[in-house]
């Protein structure tokens, strides 16, 4: 059956030529990102448990995880958490299959704790966190969906979007957070995982505002704090040169008041310890960014089941489509993908698969169009590959 693939030329100013561009990334220790990470870790653990015990992934969604902030008293050289952070794993899961009882809550709690151990290295899971789990049972009609066809049918009438390639600013914002935590943090453990990077490009000038929760026990005094944030600033300025020749100004923790020594200190590396709650889907989209200059879906990707939940599959799929089009069709300057499902219809037959393309100057759009159609059709023909990639942990959701 032929697919409804529509590729059109987009008569719009390319992102790099627009005057104003805004890009944001919430770091992995931001309360919203922690919620995303927990939800996705639980979903993947349930997938593995279902495959191990039942031979197939069963219905579940864990995309309602919530974090209620605790209370802390950070200080140079130490500090303590006075009231634990409350983390509630919420969702639906299949708890029995063909007579086999499944320990879904135990699997979820273990997955959540393992995720925190790997990502929040200064958080004491015995003292700093109360972990709770409330998983209801999936409705029988939705559970049946998983058994009907080789190609799953859509759980809802919904859409997913994706774009490529990343702009210079998008690359800078994304890699600033990633490199600070995966590279500089190994030499400067005071850098907390709770970080927000906000990028503004105004013509040829880029401003990066970084809010980074520093960990007090690794910092002796205010002078040490100032030296560390200055080293971070220099690091980011140098990093940015790998992605742009534009002028880049870096600002770190602009809310600090150095005269009163009121600075952004934490005990655990996240503001969830003191007044900042978190929820799934309030942060980064599945490409790791928040991009108001680009089309975005408001769907939370993390925690949704990777079999037939369109809010997950089509957002991840459209992003992979866009990236592959850029790789395989070099004449494309910008591409925007939109996939729309119909409830109970096969997910490899979207109601529409739309691609809007800005070709590079002097390029034949008809050539670009035909090559883009091939990429889109190929991905839809292999749509369950997205499910496999998710379960193996090969795709990020935030």
Swiss-Prot record:
Cofactor: Mg(2+)
Signal sequence bounds: none
Top EC class for this record: transferase
Alphabetically ordered keywords of this record: ATP-binding, Magnesium, Nucleotide-binding, One-carbon metabolism, Transferase
Disulfide bonds: none
One Pfam assignment: AdoMet_Synthase
MF annotations from Gene Ontology: ATP binding; magnesium ion binding; methionine adenosyltransferase activity
Name this protein carries in UniProt: S-adenosylmethionine synthase
Organism: Methanosarcina acetivorans (strain ATCC 35395 / DSM 2834 / JCM 12185 / C2A)
Lineage: Archaea, Methanobacteriati, Methanobacteriota, Stenosarchaea group, Methanomicrobia
